[in-house]
Amino acid sequence: METRMGKIYSDALGREMEYIRYGSSGKPFFAVPSQDGRYFDFANFGMVDAVADYIEQGRIQIISFDTIDRETWSNEGGDPAARMQLHEKWYHYVCDELYPHVMAETGYSGRAGTTGCSMGAYHAANFFFRRPDLFD
């Protein structure tokens, strides 16, 4: 299976963010790791292996990317307004920066899927409900 690591500078967050893409063709699925997770956790917990046949058949691609949950959702001592604003910046990074970058990189012209586990599932559902123009 083709695996490609990438970094993209986020203007919204003011930093580089990492991601990894599994597969080279098929519908892209944006996979959000569990709470406080990193881009490599989706594979480390066996989720990529679970769909490896679909990836190898060229039916799907998995794009797993970093969250900033430690600075937002899990930062219980932080200022609630600042945490919320930072989370919204991360949301805009995913939708306005990472999504177009990945879609251009893959050449896929339809809407992408979104998936995740635990808090990642919450984030995935949030992308789906807030941006049905991007995710189906």
Predicted regions and their residues:
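Non-catalytic cap/lid and distal C-terminal segments of serine-dependent acyl enzymes
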Residues: 1-136
